[in-house]
């Protein structure tokens, strides 16, 4: 999918795709990048709104990850395809509950308490948004999941973790929760 991007053109993705052994050819053509290298050479451009750099189109969301490298926050692109894939996985996980005993089938009609980062994302100058990956995924949850979703928009937007937990504790007695879910840390 990225063959027509700057990255795909530079590293000759077409050659890899046409190769008898595409995976091996890809490894030969594309050097390993650490975060600083890929950010400086590629991803930094996308923060300025440049499209088709390392993935087709413009990047609208960035997951922020603090790390051990030079940057205080690492900006990691979150593509539309990743968000779509996440929506499909929501559905798969819910449908997988059907295979289990009667208690789990009843739980399918109950709420999902999603514990994660704030959905109140930081807006960048080129129109993109950045925040915790879990906050992005919660904000971009599928429309059909809204009915089951707790803690709700107001509480989910809170960036102060202690305040968020206090609000959840205060309101949880009124929710019919069958599942507690979250996004694993990096």
What is each PLM-predicted segment?
Residues 1-64, 70-185:
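Nucleotide 5′-phosphate-binding alpha/beta core
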């Amino acid at each position: 999918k990225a063959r027509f991007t700057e990255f795909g053109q530079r590293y000759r993705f077409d050659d890899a795709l046409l190769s008898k052994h595409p995976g091996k050819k890809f490894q030969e053509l594309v050097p390993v990048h650490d975060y600083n290298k890929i950010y400086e050479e590629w991803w930094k451009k996308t923060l300025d709104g440049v499209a088709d750099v390392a993935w087709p189109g413009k990047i609208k969301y960035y997951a922020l990850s603090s790390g051990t490298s030079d940057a205080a926050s690492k900006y990691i692109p979150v593509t539309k395809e990743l968000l779509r894939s996440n929506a499909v996985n929501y559905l798969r996980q819910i449908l997988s509950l059907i295979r289990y005993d009667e208690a789990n089938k009843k739980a399918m009609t109950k709420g999902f308490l999603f514990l994660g980062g704030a959905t109140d994302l930081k807006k960048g100058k080129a129109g993109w948004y950045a925040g915790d990956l879990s906050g992005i995924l919660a904000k971009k949850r599928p429309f059909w999941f809204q009915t089951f979703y707790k803690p709700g928009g107001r509480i989910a937007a809170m960036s102060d973790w202690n305040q968020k937990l206090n609000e959840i504790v205060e309101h949880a007695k009124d929710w019919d929760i069958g599942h507690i879910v979250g996004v694993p840390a990096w």
